[in-house]
UniProtKB/Swiss-Prot annotation:
Keyword match Lyase: no
Family stated for the protein in its record: Belongs to the ABC transporter superfamily. ABCG family. PDR (TC 3.A.1.205) subfamily.
Protein name: ABC transporter G family member 36
Disordered: region residues: 14-43, 821-841
Amino acid sequence: MDAAGEIQKVASMRLGGSMRGDSGSMWRRGDDVFSRSSREEDDEEALRWAALEKLPTYDRVRRAILPLGGDDGAGDGGGKGVVDVHGLGPRERRALLERLVRVADEDNEKFLLKLKDRVDRVGIDMPTIEVRFEHLEAEAEVRVGNSGLPTVLNSITNTLEEAGNALGILPNRKQTMPVLHDVSGIIKPRRMTLLLGPPGSGKTTLLLALAGRLGKDLKASGKVTYNGHGMEEFVPERTAAYISQHDLHIGEMTVRETLAFSARCQGVGSRFDMLTELSRREKAANIKPDADIDAFMKAAAMGGQEANVNTDYILKILGLEICADTMVGDEMLRGISGGQRKRVTTGEMLVGPARALFMDEISTGLDSSTTFQIVNSLRQTVHILGGTAVISLLQPAPETYNLFDDIILLSDGQIVYQGPREDVLEFFESMGFKCPDRKGVADFLQEVTSKKDQRQYWARHDKPYRFVTVKEFVSAFQSFHTGRAIANELAVPFDKSKSHPAALATTRYGAPGKELLKANIDREILLMKRNSFVYMFRTFQLMVVSLIAMTLFFRTKMKRDSVTSGGIYMGALFFGVLMIMFNGFSELALTVFKLPVFFKQRDLLFYPAWSYTIPSWILKIPITFIEVGGYVFLTYYVIGFDSNVGSFFKQYLLMLAINQMAGSLFRFIGGAARNMIVANVFASFMLLIFMVLGGFILAREQVKKWWIWGYWISPMMYAQNAISVNELMGHSWNKIVNSSASNETLGVQVLKSRGVFPEARWYWIGFGAMIGFTILFNALFTLALTYLRPYGNSRQSVSEEELKEKRANLNGEIVGDVHLSSGSTRRPMGNGTENDSTIVDDDTEVTQRGMVLPFTPLSLSFDNVRYSVDMPQEMKAQGVADDRLELLKGVSGSFRPGVLTALMGVSGAGKTTLMDVLAGRKTGGYIEGSINISGYPKKQETFARVSGYCEQNDIHSPQVTVYESLLFSAWLRLPEDVDSNTRKMFIEEVMELVELKSLRDALVGLPGVNGLSTEQRKRLTIAVELVANPSIIFMDEPTSGLDARAAAIVMRTVRNTVNTGRTVVCTIHQPSIDIFEAFDELFLMKRGGEEIYAGPLGHHSSELIKYFESIPGVSKIKDGYNPATWMLEVTTIGQEQALGVDFSDIYKKSELYQRNKALIKDLSQPAPDSSDLYFPTQYSQSSLTQCMACLWKQNLSYWRNPPYNAVRFFFTTVIALLFGTIFWDLGGKVTKSQDLFNAMGSMYAAVLFIGVMNCTSVQPVVAVERTVFYRERAAGMYSAFPYAFGQVVIEIPYTLVQATVYGIIVYAMIGFEWTAAKFFWYLFFMVFTLLYFTFYGMMAVGLTPNYHIASIVSSAFYAIWNLFSGFVIPRPRVPIWWRWYCWACPVAWTLYGLVVSQFGDIETPMEDGTPVKVFVENYFGFKHSWLGWVATVVAAFAFLFASLFGFAIMKFNFQKR
């Protein structure tokens, strides 16, 4: 009997045995029952293993023994059986994991030890990787000073210069900036390495270099080897996993789907081969493994599974099970939290088989306990299974720091220390620096090499302190025993023969091409389902347009009696082709939005580009049938096209091919452009060329010989020819109207009048061309994604000082003042000694002398504050009866001048809510209770003038410098009587205080893209508020997302601010000991919006600890433990339930509460001789000054925005030259109607395309600035009108230049009549048309929540404006029920003005004897006498859209708080 039969027999024995056992069981003695049943089970288990072992090895590794049945999947009541692990369902996988790793914290280590034990028993070595790097150097090319600022002028000169460099005719003015300098070291397997270093020290560059992922924008030298093998000998991307600090994921996929897809692409590595060998050796040694471990290893080693048990395991150890089936989300789609997203980024690489991990800042947004759990799980994996890991962390808590074996400390691109964690303090003590008792070692290491922080750690009081440079540390480390040991080890090359054959990956991809294609197909289907709204909206949009088209070109109004009426049918066909083409436009955005994730996965070698591009094409075909069907089926017979059913289906078939071609074209453009602004411009450009040379706007005979090649390669030409031939060669047109010598049918006459080939075969030529273009564009799309790199976001420019300092640090020279941070002028943060304080300020003058500008210290007290919102519909649906949800429940407290208060609590406690209520930033909800400012009731108008609010998201205009941001804030927020010089002195003082002097001319940039780092951005946020000279400052999480040193810099800024006598309140999340103890008082809240402690912290948090330890049952704090962490742990809801207490009640019965109440009462009474805050006007500055300031900032922003302005000028100039050459000399002579149509075609195409380009490209610019506007308006800087004024007015000069450049080039080349009046009329209409298009785009942003919706809303009107412009169908031929819209369509008025100003007064007769003027009046309905009115209406449209933008900005606030 074969082995499979044996397994069947075992299963039947199990069934029969159980029945027999049941019948006799009642007669047995109790103890015998248990002994028999367990004996029987053992026998059956043995039989199963025996049967399993008889299987061939290949089959044996695919099958495992698992519990069967049971409702919970745990196998209860179902017995065990042999299962094919390839088909394990979610329930079986979950049950298996539940048995192996029930609680990740407790069971993971035991589980890994079982895995290791199984492998060790048969003597299999696990592959390990030792990474060595020797003399690693990296340099970046940067522009120094102002030449690096991205102004329109710089962008043009820099582009020309780079072209000159490439040709070798111009010298390279860029300078090199060192990033890494001569770093060498060894990363050992089975050891956890922590990478530390201040911001900009080169941590990311080092990790990228070690992972073999260094970009081509850096000049690198040196050697990195894995087990002695150079990078070229294996595939580093698959051997090592680099986990980026940027979280790039597809928002529409769930966490589980994201990880499962990643696991599918990365494959299982050598797991299957190892398992086969393991199984063979176990069989030979007659070893029976643990059934669950066997099942897990087999399931994890199977490639090609849609869901792998390893994915479920990673979800568990990363704590992502709770959100496994939640969408990841993005800025448009609500999803998981930032911390969870960070863990998904980590999990995405952990599910793969890589044995070396390089992890960049994986703890951002995570609380310390989650970080500890993740790092601990990684540590267990590395130690037990022999992995290699280098992890950089921002603010590791002491308990997380202690999990690491080795430390690498980087500073200024050099390794200051590398080696065992235990020896690091010894090294620094040998240099004279000591870590204080209450200081985290990681925090100490990040600060000890910094000029500003070093002095406080100097421990040799017998010697005077002298700044020790990084170079001195580096050379001292080389003679330190750890440094010598590393140098000695590096001197002996790694023995390549000792490298495990499975350690290094040599195949390019982790799975076969067929499997990767299948994975991408499955993902694309999933995304199409999730994005179904886009396709439904697209279809709906097409339906709406088809309804307009069929009622506009209505069959009762459509005659077949002349060539002119045939032209109207041609217009209807042209419009149909254009709409089907435009329908594919949304592919552009869908492609570009997915590219960042694609590039990440491509570069990690998840899959080749072809496996991504094929599904994105093939799977869209079924949708095309629906979309095109909707248009053709609705319009064909209603418009009255040829009644032959064959012609109908041929039109449908051709439209399908056109839609496929258009979708492929836009996918290719998106893939080649890789950026939404460039893609939009490029797509508009391609559409324009294809359209103008497509044979409808300009007849073939009129195309100049130098452009005829463009006619032959235009897909629109083939589409237009094919669809025209299909209609006009049909039965309905097969009649002779005006008998001519040739007796041509009417259809042929119409085709010839428009220059179309009157041959039936052109239908199939056109159809074949559409298929050919579709294949070509998809091939080009694949090539673009295979070879193009994403745009770099590296810094292109640095200041002269920064470069000088970088170079000086390399040489060990000292630049600038070092003794910035020695003594202390405030209460020390640590144990009271001077050396212990991190957040200090040596400059006694700054804190003691007061600022240049005086301010009035103010206190803020609040009593019984309640805040509620309308009950969310989801909660009402769950049966909650209340109408309101209360978020703050009677909170009372006070904040005083010169006192730094921390506002803390777990997530959901209401910290930010309370701060928003007190600061008056809430845009909805219901507020009750009293809030007083120095005893007077708070009035929001005056309060905004004396308060500052530093938001958690650092929102600033990206195109201005640090100094300009501060100047703008001070200009609008300081009183009018402060003169310009005093204002500038005050800004200088604030920059000194906030340590921004070195960044004075740095561009702010966009977060995560370019410009300032997170920590610099935080300091700018604080400075922007400080220059307003406020008395009260609110700060929302000023240290989140920062490393320890950056957080210390920010906190030093905050402390300096308090020392000037201001009232400062900060919400803070998971602070380190020294940051926490920098605060004077704490206001602690619990979930649900109630306070549980409000009072002083005391020396070493003694007051806080005393208060909570006095509550019965609360556990005592351990020595050296962070009081902030302890406090949050002992006050959780779980603790309340365990102790049976309510911390809020305890607080309200305490003596502390009574003291606080008395203080609130005291602060609620105005001081004698004081007066309430009063300002004569709502804003500091007059409306005129506000307008000037807003215009000043917009001017800077626009000048420094080349992607917007330089691209628009370039695009306009190129189009002007193209139009000039295409329509060369066609405007001068009008001898027949086609000449007029050609000239009008040039006007129509330019107006529509340049106008639409202006409209789409302004939207992202306005959307970014609007976010800044919300913050600045809330801060009381200006009203809505000055902002709208600045945004509108700054467009005028740029549009004027754009229209003038276009007008001069085109007017001269097309050869319109050279009279001053006609030229200036032409210019006038172009200027105001481009303005109203631009203002229309701005208005769409103003009326919608974000720019994605704005682009959808605005694009809905493009098609309608196109249709009613008067070119496709002239106004007199429009049915009466639609004629009103001809007067409401701005483009129709523009064409009216342009045509009538050029041709409306020409009396010269055409070939048929009709004067041009009469033809214009009869055919188009354009009268020259109306010219003045037309001009007024066109200008009025610009004014109307600008006014609506201003109105929308004033009335709508889409920011929900």
